């Protein structure tokens, strides 16, 4: 749906893709639609800017890449932190060796949303909502308010929880700064332990990425009282540590 003076609104995105004067599209839908809409846009001759996460599962990424290559379309993922000047400056410091050898990275996503998002009953979708279109490629389920915006992120049918919500941004920065091409293994443990709602994805999760020459730890808490989230990322090196989030960055160096 488009908004703004003079903009044309579409109930069916396929009609938008039929417009010959549209050169590019932005896909900012629930996650389970990202890859399919991106592929359809490429097939229609449009360049694509798609919100993260790019896909819901790995195979979708491979399909989208093949179609983008075949149609020679530009596809960019919305990991907008790369546009931040302080993220660019921090990258220069790390890649210049200012921190020495990086041996580990910690990614934090800590907040407290206890007791959760409630347990609303299944019911009828709101008037004006095309629920079949909203589901799209997802499994058929009865409508539930928590499966709509914004909380669809806590259901496996549509998303991957905070790992693919906030974790996607953090991992992109790690990849940009250090590279993840030597990734050997990923180990994850957690569950929905604390929140009393109908969500499915973990509210507590610890993930370790073995990247060959360094490790990355993702620490996610949705029900942690008293511990501030602080900086989203910490890069630990032999000469110092750099902590960074969207507000700025700070470096601690040995004397």
Task: Name these PLM-found stretches.
Residues 14-17, 26, 39-42, 65, ...:
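Non-transmembrane alpha-helical segments in soluble domains
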Residues 63-81, 90, 98-105:
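Rossmann-fold dehydrogenase core element
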């Amino acid at each position: 749906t488009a908004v703004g003076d003079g903009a044309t609104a579409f109930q069916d995105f396929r009609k938008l893709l039929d417009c010959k004067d549209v050169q590019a599209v932005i896909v900012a839908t629930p996650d389970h639609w990202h890859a399919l809409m991106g592929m359809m846009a490429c097939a229609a001759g449009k360049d694509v800017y798609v919100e993260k996460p790019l896909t819901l599962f790995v195979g979708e990424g491979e399909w989208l890449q093949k179609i983008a290559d075949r149609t020679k379309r530009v596809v960019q993922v919305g990991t907008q932190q790369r546009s931040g000047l302080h993220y660019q400056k921090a990258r220069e410091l790390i890649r210049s060796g200012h921190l020495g050898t990086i041996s580990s990275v910690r990614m934090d996503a800590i907040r407290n949303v206890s007791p959760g998002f409630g347990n609303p009953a299944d019911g009828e979708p709101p008037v004006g909502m095309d629920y079949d279109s909203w589901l799209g490629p997802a499994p058929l389920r009865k409508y539930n308010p928590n499966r709509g915006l914004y909380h669809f992120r806590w259901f496996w049918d549509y998303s991957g929880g905070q790992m693919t919500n906030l974790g996607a941004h953090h991992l992109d920065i790690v990849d940009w700064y250090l590279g993840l091409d030597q990734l050997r293994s990923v180990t994850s443990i957690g569950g929905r332990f604390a929140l009393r709602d109908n969500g499915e994805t973990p509210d507590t999760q610890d993930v370790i990425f073995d990247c060959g020459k360094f490790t990355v730890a993702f620490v996610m808490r949705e029900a942690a009282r008293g511990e501030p989230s602080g900086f989203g990322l910490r890069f630990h090196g032999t000469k110092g540590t750099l902590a960074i989030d969207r507000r700025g960055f700070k470096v601690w160096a040995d004397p």
